[in-house]
Design a protein with these regions (language model features):
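C-terminal transmembrane-helix exit sites in multi-pass transporters
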Residues: 5-7, 24-46, 165-186
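Loop-to-transmembrane-helix transition segments
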Residues: 1-4, 68-76, 115, 120-140
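Hydrophobic transmembrane alpha-helices of multi-pass small-molecule transport proteins
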Residues: 43-60, 184-203
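Membrane-interface helix-cap regions at the ends of transmembrane helices
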Residues: 3, 53-64, 107-128, 174-178, ...
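Hydrophobic/small/kink-forming positions within alpha-helical transmembrane segments
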Residues: 3, 25-30, 55, 78-82, ...
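Transmembrane alpha-helical segments that form core, pore/gating elements
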Residues: 65-122
Length: 209
């Protein structure tokens, strides 16, 4: 998935990538119906609809011309969904730490191989930033793994919370980079928060059957 991200971001804009990547919850609902036999309720549909519209309003993508890399992003979102479905379906196979280590082992081995072939010299400051970013991303992956592994009866409604990352990105952009949103984007942020709120009764309804 990181490879797909790097390749696509070289060929499409960030707003287009973000919007297409947010199709993952839609894939999640379809797979939850087929493979997990979950009962999908109206709150889940409202959460998905509100979240996706919110993303469109925030990133405001152009999509002026079709780009073959759009399909690659959708494929990446599909792979993410497959991974989380496996975590949920086979939750008793190993611990969260086990899934985390097994999944990351191959990626890190391949990364070291490419680094040895083409080593990159960087300054200490850049190395420090990369290290901090690595800690944060691995922590995020671990927590996501735990969430999807333990969300036995409400996988689809948990996935709806993915849309909240757009709100956090916007807040960080305002605080650290002085990137302010327009009115439409703020409306989108409200819809994304609303999406997270809809996911709460969605989870309760799934638990109650």
């Amino acid at each position: 998935m990181p490879f797909i991200t790097f390749v696509t971001l070289k060929n499409i804009t960030l707003p287009e990538y973000t919007t297409l990547n947010m199709s993952a919850p839609i894939f999640a609902i379809l797979m939850a119906l087929i493979f997990l036999k979950e009962k999908i309720n109206i709150y889940i549909f409202l959460s998905i609809l509100s979240g996706f519209l919110g993303v469109l309003f925030v990133v405001q993508p152009g999509f002026e011309n079709f780009n073959i890399y759009f399909l690659l992003v959708l494929f990446g979102a599909f792979l993410i969904t497959i991974t989380t479905i496996i975590l949920n379906k086979y939750n008793n196979t190993t611990s969260t730490l086990g899934f985390f280590i097994y999944a990351g082992l191959v990626v890190h081995i391949i990364s070291w191989f490419f680094f040895l072939l083409d080593p990159l010299k960087i300054s200490f400051n850049i190395f420090l930033f990369i290290t901090i970013a690595s800690i944060f991303i691995n922590l995020a992956i671990f927590l996501s793994t735990y969430a999807f592994q333990t969300s036995q009866k409400y996988y689809a409604s948990i996935f709806c919370l993915v849309y909240l990352q757009i709100v956090w990105s916007s807040i960080i952009g305002i605080i650290f980079f002085k990137e302010y949103l327009n009115f439409v984007a703020y409306l989108g942020a409200f819809l994304i928060v609303l999406s997270g709120i809809f996911s709460i009764p969605a989870q309760k309804k799934q638990l109650n059957g």
